[in-house]
Curated annotation (Swiss-Prot):
Database matches in PANTHER family: AROM/DEHYDROQUINATE SYNTHASE (PTHR21090), PENTAFUNCTIONAL AROM POLYPEPTIDE (PTHR21090:SF5)
Listed name of the protein: 3-phosphoshikimate 1-carboxyvinyltransferase
Residues that, per the record, bind 3-phosphoshikimate: 22-23, 27, 170-172, 198, 314, 337, 341
Family the UniProt entry places it in: Belongs to the EPSP synthase family.
Reaction(s) this enzyme catalyzes, per UniProt: 3-phosphoshikimate + phosphoenolpyruvate = 5-O-(1-carboxyvinyl)-3-phosphoshikimate + phosphate
Organism annotation: Shewanella halifaxensis (strain HAW-EB4)
Lineage: Bacteria, Pseudomonadati, Pseudomonadota, Gammaproteobacteria, Alteromonadales
């Protein structure tokens, strides 16, 4: 087993240019594929999830050219759906941002497709999306367990019509449905059942669809209307914003042990909801400064918060470890969907926080964290979850340091994370 020892860090300062957003990268690749014209994507994220998407697109006949560092991609659109003359099996690792949108997109054209992934992918639900696609006439079947990948898709195009989709588990299901709806054979009316989680991720989807020339009528997130006969048209260039969830670790570092840490690539003009993480740090007492495309965090005495963080579920994980350096009990609420991510993040976070001495209350959809008088070092298990590894790097700001098991799991979104993190200490 690989282990990384982080010795105590007394002070951090510097500037970090954040790698491209995973959410935006994979959405933009799919829209560029369905669009007419050639799209140049810059600041594309170079990570596992994006590689799975690119490999699948290539297998399905999509032509693209990548720069040497894999962050610029020039992709020739198909001006319509993906088709396959022969049955295709696509392996998507543990990339939810590839599995869900591709599952929907492959129902638009003609062909036979099998979607598979790593063992954890077979535990991540997709039933709500499949149910919605079936309401529009798609033929999708489960190869193992009902409601979970692997999947078989026999596609003959998607009908228009009325469709209901659950909103309370993952916004990725709605994102997938929205992106394919314009290419259905008739108007699509989507009604959301229950409360829609992670609304800001839907805003990312709608903003990108608009960039590619498609209009969606959003009725206060309770329903959406997508008119038929629309076509995606390449805007020519798409700049992928820095990943706001990835920015959260560096901003927290500045708040806990700054100096001054500046992250570039995200800011006031960002379309990602996770930039609101900086507002939470500010509520905890941090000194935050906003620019159009940067955010600066400076150290301050941090105090606990009690907040609903449904709108920033990924970045909220960073608050759980930042709470170790705040006075009082921090409570993070309405985060049930942590349980269906790369691992059951609620259970994993509770287990690992207790290792360093925190008093933790783990509920069905919340976690509360009270720091001990003195933090102790531990070997942190990462559960093959990139965010667990990055969150617990904050323990380097304790007098005891920390050991991270299997640190290479950050390759899912941020292969270079620990090099960048250590650079701030020097």
């Amino acid at each position: 087993m690989n282990q990384l020892r982080l010795e105590p860090i007394k002070k951090v300062s510097g500037t970090i240019n954040i790698p491209g957003s995973k959410s935006i990268s994979n959405r933009a690749l799919l829209l560029a594929t369905l669009a007419s014209g050639t799209t140049t994507l810059t600041n594309l994220l170079d990570s596992d999830d994006i590689r799975y998407m690119l490999a699948s697109l290539k297998q399905l006949g999509v032509s693209y050219r990548l720069s040497n560092n894999n962050t610029v991609c020039e992709l020739d659109g198909l001006a319509g759906p993906l088709n396959a003359g022969e049955p295709q099996t696509l392996f998507l690792g543990n990339a939810g941002t590839a599995m869900r949108p591709l599952c929907a997109a492959l129902t638009l054209g003609q062909g036979q497709f099998t979607l598979t992934g790593e063992p954890r992918m077979e535990e991540r639900p997709i039933g709500d999306l499949v149910d919605a696609l079936r309401q529009l006439g798609a033929e999708v079947s489960y190869l193992k367990n009902e409601g979970f990948p692997p999947l078989n898709i026999t596609s003959t195009g998607l009908n228009g019509g009325n469709v209901e989709i659950a909103g309370d588990l993952s916004s990725q299901f709605l994102t997938a449905l929205l992106m394919v709806a314009p290419l259905a054979k008739g108007d699509v009316n989507i009604k959301i059942k229950g409360e829609l989680v992670s609304k800001p991720y839907i805003d990312i989807t709608l903003a990108l669809m608009a960039q590619f020339g498609v209009e969606v009528q959003n009725n206060d997130y309770a329903s959406f209307v997508i008119k038929a006969g629309q076509r995606y048209v390449s805007p020519g260039k798409v700049l992928v914003e820095g990943d706001a969830s990835s920015a959260s670790y560096f901003l927290a570092a500045g708040a806990i042990q700054g100096g001054e840490v500046k992250v570039t690539g995200v800011g006031k003009l960002s379309i990602q909801g996770d930039v609101k993480f900086a507002d939470v740090l500010e509520q905890m007492g941090a000194d935050i400064e906003w620019g159009d495309d940067y955010i600066i965090a400076r150290q301050a005495k941090l105090k606990a918060v009690d907040l609903d963080m449904n709108h920033i579920p990924d970045a909220a994980m960073t608050i759980a470890t930042a709470a170790l350096f705040a006075t009082g009990t921090t409570r993070i609420r309405n985060i049930y969907n942590w349980r269906i991510k790369e691992t059951d993040r609620l259970a994993a976070m509770a287990t690992e926080l207790r290792k360093v001495g925190a008093i933790v209350d783990e509920g069905h959809d919340y976690i509360s964290v009270t720091p001990p008088a003195k933090l102790n070092t531990a070997a942190i298990d990462t559960y093959n979850d990139h965010r667990m590894a990055m969150c617990f790097s904050m323990m380097a700001f304790a007098d005891c340091g920390i050991t991270i098991n299997e640190p290479e799991c950050t390759s899912k979104t941020f292969p270079d994370y620990f090099n960048q993190f250590n650079a701030l200490a020097n």
